[in-house]
């Protein structure tokens, strides 16, 4: 399956995606660049789907990716039940203009 490489080594890219996924689930909304936002949307939807499954195996899979146990608890107890009837599309990506320093396209990623 194709994915974005972000001009980073595998470990750095994986750590970046883990960090921004954890931040999104913790705060509900983050601002990042457009390519990162589009990749984050894929991963965040997978994590919320794990939360909807709700069993021990899904919880351990989420803990293997999300860095904070409190965020996993929040995901399974508060976020996942909110999307119980929704079949995917748990995140929204809104364009937020361009960053001043380097004119990178920015986006707001939020939970629907």
From Swiss-Prot:
PROSITE patterns: RIBOSOMAL_L17. It comes from the Bacteria. Keywords: Ribonucleoprotein, Ribosomal protein. PANTHER family: LARGE RIBOSOMAL SUBUNIT PROTEIN BL17M (PTHR14413:SF16), RIBOSOMAL PROTEIN L17 (PTHR14413). Part of the 50S ribosomal subunit. Contacts protein L32. NCBIfam families: L17. Belongs to the bacterial ribosomal protein bL17 family. This is Large ribosomal subunit protein bL17. It comes from Heliobacterium modesticaldum (strain ATCC 51547 / Ice1). The gene is rplQ.
